[in-house]
């Protein structure tokens, strides 16, 4: 959908970030939609609002003036949002003259000349910034150099460490389709970067991870895979790592919070021997094979390090040992892993995992974020089809293709030409975007495997409703096609009287 994100998804994205434990968002490299700012106000997220621009400067004087005009308009639009913590009134990663930087700073003061104004932030290495700006962008360690700035230091983009800017190979970037091990490497890489920011002096105040969501980009053939969510907002292991950094005592009226444990392990024939657990509890107890073996380890909360270090249980998983229960003893139910989070000696949260067996059925869920789908013709939600075994365990190694169909007041965004429908299963799931029509009503989503059969996973259905739009539509609908054209189009878009996605028979 590109930049055509409806207001509901702006809110859902802000909540997803709050769920992950984020408390500050840098809206690079341009201001976000006003609905995103409203969501940040509601959810308690600080925002750094950046003026549009990235890695380009034009010596024509009019270019700088146009940037300054953008900055004034940006501040006037967002200055009454309580979520705004900083303005970024300069161009990202761009070399510009001193007078431009000073004028940009003056504009932030002119447009909000009151006590407690949002501060201005810019790169410490750019002209005039270290000497004049309120906050400087830098890195952990800049606060301990001899020429360190006097202002607070903030890292505008942390987590990236590419081998070079041509190949873009990087251990913090992992597609969900690559599976368990790359996702774990990504999570631990980001944990290391996050940890580095705590090994600093009080001059260093934090940073923003680049970037929370996988996305397409114009300057490189690969999508950006460094998100803690994929492009369809499915969580990766890195999401759980960041969520584990929030205090177990935190309470929030809208966001996910509280004690948590997460096992970053799928118990497959290819899984690592070590089991990594993310938790914000005092300690973690790991049991396998119905408690046949049990270990307990503390969650390290060391001063000068990230709040809750990942817990690693060494040499726990052995596929051949698990096979002795399922194959030799015919007791596959005993092959399980239970992780318990303990605070003050009491178990406060639990997660149970089992290896997925054969793929037998599909399961659908809608990622609504507790926000209704609005019948305005542009709102949409993500519906996810998971391939599971008989017991509901997601089959992470499944390689199916899922065909989606919709009945009622909804449509599928995309078709076979872009791999949207049918959709290949990645890491056990296949997402699809369901868009509302302009009429409120029931929507039924059906999912089946592309190649059906008696041994193939069974189909699934999910039904939900859209709600009426808040405001009436301001347009007049007219039919301009002739009767012959309308008849031809209807025939092209139906098979046996049913609507079908393009490219699917």
Please annotate each region the language model reported.
Residues 265-271, 371-381:
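Short, solvent-exposed loop/linker segments at the N-terminal edge
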Residues 346-356, 455-467:
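Edge beta-strands of extracellular beta-sandwich domains
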Residues 209, 216-269, 274-363, 394-395:
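Catalytic cores of secreted or luminal carbohydrate-active enzymes
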Residues 301-316, 365, 370, 408-427:
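Low-complexity "stalk/linker" and mucin-like segments enriched in Ser/Thr/Pro/Ala/Gly
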Residues 275-279, 379-396, 443-447:
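Beta-strand-rich structural segments
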Residues 8-16, 24-240, 255-266, 270, ...:
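Substrate-binding/catalytic cleft of secreted carbohydrate-active enzymes
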Residues 293-301, 397-411, 420-421, 460-464:
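Short, well-ordered beta-strand segments
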Residues 252, 353-376, 466-491, 497:
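Low-complexity, Pro/Ser/Thr- and charge-rich linker/hinge segments at domain boundaries
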